[in-house]
A protein has these predicted regions:
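A generic local secondary-structure boundary/capping motif
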Residues: 7-9, 17-20, 55-58, 91, ...
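Short coil/turn connectors at secondary-structure junctions
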Residues: 3-6, 14-15, 23-28, 62-67, ...
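Active-site glycine-rich loop that binds ribose-phosphate moieties when present
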Residues: 117-127, 161-182, 256-258
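Acidic-glycine-rich active-site phosphate/pyrophosphate-binding loop
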Residues: 18-29, 172-178, 243-254
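Glycine-rich anion-binding loops of enzyme active sites
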Residues: 22-38, 63-159, 298
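Glycine-/charge-enriched secondary-structure boundary and capping motifs
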Residues: 75-100, 107-112, 184-185, 194-311
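Small-aliphatic-rich amphipathic alpha-helix that forms the alpha element of a beta-alpha
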Residues: 42-68, 85-96, 174-186, 196-205
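N-terminal glycine-rich phosphate/pyrophosphate-binding loops that anchor nucleotide-derived ligands
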Residues: 1-59, 134-139, 144, 162, ...
Length: 311
């Protein structure tokens, strides 16, 4: 446990970024993320990884300031052109976010890895955490899910080009607009949906907020091809582990199949924001943001299980 009074959130919480208090109500946010390629195109991989790294700042209501590259690359095995394309993808996505990449660190490694350290800023009274959800709130999810299943299918050469393109477009999309729209409406809790899957991150919100959530499966949107692929047996190991964990804290409708439950727990890369917000503001958000954002459920008083999935 960190005893420094300037530290607001750190590794002991399940929030999306480290937050340190400066002065005059200002705070610094910092996060780091990197991973191995999940698509074949180097430039697209760089874009996706950068968008994923930036997401944690947006999920806390912060404004990114600058970033550093983290690079691992097998310099003796792969062409420098591939590395240049990866880093160009990251640089272009950072530019879209309005920030520079000002440095970084690289090592020789057996497998390519790429990501960013991102530093952001915010006003302390305005930051979001996952601990403020209140009974009566509506839950909004801003992107479809299914990237883990599709990424696994890409590696197995089981994904069509149309499915790959759809998932890549979703993963490349910054959560910038969603965060900016939400900042006008003061949501009660926000997180981004990433490695623990939708249900896993929702469990974190409910436990941190001492509430429960009621989700309508039929309102959740899945990426093109994700349902077909899981029905064909494409099941990422991380997503299965997520489901094993979620079943200890979730009441799943008996009408849901194993594959449907797995989709809800699919580990995401550069997923959307999960927003807990008052009903009147939820409607405003959906009208202003547009896109593929949907209301997927509501927050309720605490029950034994933090999450219930209806069908």
């Amino acid at each position: 446990m960190n005893t420094n009074d300037s530290v607001i959130t750190d590794y002991t919480s399940t929030d999306d970024a480290a937050v340190v208090r400066l002065s005059d109500g200002k705070i610094i946010l910092q996060t780091v993320d990197f991973f191995t390629p999940i698509v074949d195109d180097p430039y697209t991989f760089g874009q996706i990884s950068a968008a994923n790294s930036l997401s944690d700042i947006y999920a806390m209501g912060g404004k990114p300031l600058f970033a550093l590259n983290i690079v691992a690359f097998p310099i003796q095995k792969l062409s420098n052109t591939i590395l240049s394309e990866i880093m160009q993808g990251g640089a272009d996505k950072a530019a879209e976010a309005g920030i520079p990449i000002v440095g970084g660190h690289s090592i020789d490694d057996n497998e390519p890895k790429y990501g960013l350290v991102v530093t952001g800023e915010a006003i302390e009274k305005n930051i979001w955490t996952n601990a403020g959800a209140k009974p009566g709130d509506h839950l909004i999810l801003t992107k479809p899910i299914g990237t883990g299943i599709i990424s696994t299918a890409i590696k197995k050469e089981k994904a069509s080009q149309a499915v790959t393109d759809s998932a890549s477009e979703s993963m490349k999309e910054l959560n910038k607009k969603a965060s900016e729209v939400a900042q006008h409406l003061q949501p009660n809790a926000v997180t981004d949906v990433t490695g623990f899957g939708l249900v896993g991150h929702l469990i974190e919100v409910c436990n941190a907020s001492n509430v429960s959530a009621n989700i309508d499966f039929k309102e959740i949107e899945f990426l093109h091809g994700a349902i077909d692929l899981v029905n064909e047996g494409i099941m990422p190991g991380g997503s299965k582990r997520n489901l094993d964990h979620a079943e200890n804290f979730t009441t799943f409708s008996s009408k849901l199949s194993f594959n449907q439950k797995l989709l809800l727990c699919d580990a995401q890369t550069s997923g959307g924001l999960l927003i807990s917000i008052q009903p009147k503001d939820a409607e405003k958000f959906l009208n202003e943001f547009g896109g593929k954002a949907k209301k997927i459920g509501e927050i309720e008083p605490r029950r034994v299980n933090p999450v219930t999935i209806n069908f």
